[in-house]
Amino acid sequence: MNFTEKENYNFNDLVEIVKILRAPDGCPWDREQTHKSIRSNFIEETYEAVEAIDTDDLDLLKEELGDVLLQVALHAEIESEQGTFDINDVCDGICKKLIIHHPHVFGDVNADTTEKVLKNWDAIKMKTKSQKTQTQAILSVSRALPSLMRSTKIQQKAAKVGFDWENVNGALDKLFEECEELKAAVENNDVENQREELGDVLFSAVNVARFLNIDSEHALYDACDKFTDRFSSVEKLANERGIDMKTAPLSVLDSLWDEVKLSKNY
């Protein structure tokens, strides 16, 4: 193996290390990996980087961004071995994309506000992707996105051609309507429609969040944290009072829940 260790490494060193790991005399595990086998790794590393951002942990962010870069380098190396493209092609593609998407910086287009920039981007994306209708633009939203995020993007694209409520009240009314339809499906034991109606409720809730300029992913993220914190306090309180949560009546647990809710002011 022809590799010299040194004090500080750069991106080119990362690419070289990945090549060594994938070589016949490299690492058996790395050699066996395919795009699909490390797909979940890519997602996991990305979410860990996002968590570092959310917790404002810069040391962790530096580490997690490195893990994300490793995934990029691995996927590029897999294709480099097949002769389809390599990491330089990846860099070339994104550089060209950035230049095309910023004609107000690299060209003579006037876009001196964020609104103008975003409008230009939409026009450029539709042109470069040969999208002639807004339906094509909506279909271009990745199906692999988390569903709340995908819902938001679909709604945003539909709104750009006027297919939208006038204000949040219309979105709220639709949410209440969908909740009633879900309630009816449950009461009628209409198992076939329950999933569909629940999906409509979630989609409508995302629409309300969009009108309120609330990131639905972040809102649900915070709700999960709030529930976890409150549940932990309920469990602690139950233990202090000798209450077995597994056998205690729901009314007792609900009372503990309300007590914790009042003590924490939420």
Predicted regions and their residues:
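Flexible "arm" and connector segments at domain edges
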Residues: 1-64, 70-198, 202-266
